């Protein structure tokens, strides 16, 4: 592993045991990516920085034994990475929602072989709230624009007494998505600068409600 990556992992306070699990996941990922499209092929050479480190920052923003729902889990970013981090916590779980059967199969193998705390739900996102009635946190990466993501999250975040918080990776044009979303929703927003890409952010959203016309 490059010295710069090791330094970045140390900065995120990742234990040696977790790094070993992440390395095993990376090996599995590279193997499966030869036969199914898990991420854009052009990003495979930069797997650790572009995907693993980018995903790790979510757990740093909301550590501890929480119940997560990861929407459109795809190649496991950030859901499997969060589940690996939770393997050292006393509790917590990640529900990985992925309707593509091939990707869901990969996710099951990744969870099993890394000892991560999670399970795979091979269903459409719209069906997930009926199967996963509550959660502490929601994550999604490279899935949809913010308005659509909030529609997906609404069944959990609008439930009475809900304290669910959502975390979304967004690129340099995130403000346009925020401006569009506030025409339909009210929410508390914290913008966390990405530790990987200087123009990117992680949006932390809480106290969601729909605007009334």
Swiss-Prot record:
Which EC class is this protein assigned? transferase
Task: Tell me where it mainly resides.
Answer: cytoplasm
Q: Report one GO cellular component.
A: cytosol
| Gene3D superfamilies for this protein | Vaccinia Virus protein VP39
Reactions catalysed according to its record: guanosine(527) in 16S rRNA + S-adenosyl-L-methionine = N(7)-methylguanosine(527) in 16S rRNA + S-adenosyl-L-homocysteine
As for subcellular location, the record says:
Cytoplasm
Look up the EC number in the record and give it: 2.1.1.170
Q: Which residues form a coiled coil?
A: none
Record keywords: Cytoplasm, Methyltransferase, rRNA processing, S-adenosyl-L-methionine, Transferase
InterPro entries noted in UniProt: rRNA_ssu_MeTfrase_G, SAM-dependent_MTases_sf
Task: Name any one GO molecular function.
Answer: rRNA (guanine-N7-)-methyltransferase activity
Q: State the family named in the UniProt similarity comment for this chain.
A: Belongs to the methyltransferase superfamily. RNA methyltransferase RsmG family.
Q: What does this protein do?
A: Specifically methylates the N7 position of guanine in position 527 of 16S rRNA.
Spell out the protein name for this chain: Ribosomal RNA small subunit methyltransferase G
Instruction: Write down the species.
Output: Rhizobium meliloti (strain 1021) (Ensifer meliloti)
């Amino acid at each position: 592993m490059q010295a710069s990556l090791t330094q970045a992992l140390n900065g995120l306070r990742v234990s040696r045991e977790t790094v070993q699990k992440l390395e095993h996941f990376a090996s599995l990922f590279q193997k499966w990516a030869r036969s199914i499209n898990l991420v854009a092929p052009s990003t495979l050479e930069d797997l650790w920085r572009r995907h693993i480190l980018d995903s790790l920052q979510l757990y740093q923003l909301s550590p501890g034994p929480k119940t997560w729902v990861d929407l459109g889990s795809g190649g496991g970013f950030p859901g499997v990475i969060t589940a690996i981090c939770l393997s050292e916590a006393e509790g917590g779980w990640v529900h990985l929602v992925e309707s593509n059967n091939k990707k869901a199969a990969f996710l099951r193998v990744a969870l099993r072989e890394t000892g991560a705390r999670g399970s795979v739900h091979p269903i459409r996102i719209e069906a997930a709230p009926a199967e996963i009635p509550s959660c502490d946190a929601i994550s999604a990466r490279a899935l949809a624009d913010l308005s659509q993501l909030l529609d997906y999250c609404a069944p959990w975040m609008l439930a009475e007494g809900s304290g669910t918080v959502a975390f979304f990776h967004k690129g340099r044009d995130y403000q346009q998505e925020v401006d569009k979303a506030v025409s339909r929703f009210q929410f508390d927003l914290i913008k966390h600068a990405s530790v990987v890409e200087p123009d990117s952010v992680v949006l932390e959203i809480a106290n969601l409600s729909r605007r009334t016309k």
